[in-house]
Amino acid sequence: MFGFFKSPGNNKLPNESSNNKGGTITAGRRTSSEPILITPDFDDDDKYKNGFNDSGGLQSQTTEELEKYAVYKAEETTKGVNNCLKIAEDIRSDGARTLEMLHQQGEQINRTHEMAVDMDKDLSRGEKLLNNLGGMFSKPWKPKKTKNITGPMITPDKPSKKSENHKEEREKLGLGAKGRSSSQPALDQPTNALQKVEQEKAKQDDGLSDLSDILGDLKSMAVDMGSEIDKQNKALDHLGDDVDELNSRVQGANQRARHLLSK
C-alpha cells in the first residue's frame, strides 16, 4: 500500500554472501557445523586437586572427567618423582664434592706429617752440633728422646678392596651408577587417557630406578666418608704425638744453646 513491501523472494539477510550461487543463506550467528575454539578450563586443576569435593565427589563425575583426572594424577606423580630425583642428584653432587674435600684434607695431613719428619732430621743434626760445641772439658749433652718420629700413617687415598667388590656386585645386579635411565624405548604419542597414564607410569619407573641407583651411591659415599674421617682422626692423633715430641726436643735444644752462650 505504502510502497515499502517487497516480494518475499527478493528478501536477503544482511550477511548473505554475494557469491553464494547455491542460494543458501549464511546467517550472522555461528552455526552448529562451524568449528569452535575450545579454551582450557583453568578451574580443572582446582577440581582435581580437591578430588571433586566441590562437585559431588568422584561418584558424580562423567567417564571423561575421571579419565582426565587419572591423567592429571599420573602427571602429578611423575612430577613428584622427578623432583625427588633432582634433589637426590643435588645431594649426590654435594656428597661427591665433600668426599673430594676429605681426600684433599687427608693429603694435607700426610704432607704436614712428612714436614714433621724433615724437621726431625734437621733437629737431629742441630742437636749433634750443640753437643759438639760443649768442648772436651764440658759435660756431654744428650737430647731427650721419648719416641721416634715415624711419619704419616696414611698414604694417598686408594679405593679399598671392599669398595671395589661392592661396586662390582652392584654392576652385576644392574645397579651401577648410570645417570638418567634411557632403557625405555621412545613411546608414540598417546591417543587416549589410558595410553597417557601408561606413558607416565613408564616415566615413573625410570625415575624410581634412577633414584634407587643414586641412593645406593649415597650409601657408598657415606661409608667412604666414615672410613676417611676415622683414618684422618687416627692420623691427626699420631701427628699430634710427633709434634709434641718435636716441641719437647726444640725446647731442650734452646736450653742447651742458652747454656752455651752463658759461658
From Swiss-Prot:
InterPro entries: NPSN/SNAP25-like_N_SNARE, T_SNARE_dom. PROSITE patterns: T_SNARE (PS50192). Coiled coil: none annotated. One of its GO terms (molecular function) is SNAP receptor activity. It is found in: Membrane; Cytoplasm. It is a peripheral membrane protein. This is Putative SNAP25 homologous protein SNAP30. Residues 158-173, 197-206 have a biased composition (Basic and acidic residues). Keywords: Coiled coil, Cytoplasm, Membrane, Protein transport, Transport. The keyword Cell membrane does not apply. Transmembrane segments: none annotated. Residues 198-260 form the t-SNARE coiled-coil homology domain. The keyword Membrane applies. Vesicle trafficking protein that functions in the secretory pathway. Its main location: membrane. Residues 8-34, 52-61, 180-194 have a biased composition (Polar residues). Residues 1-61, 132-209 are annotated as: Disordered. Belongs to the SNAP-25 family. One of its GO terms (biological process) is protein transport. GO terms for cellular component: SNARE complex.
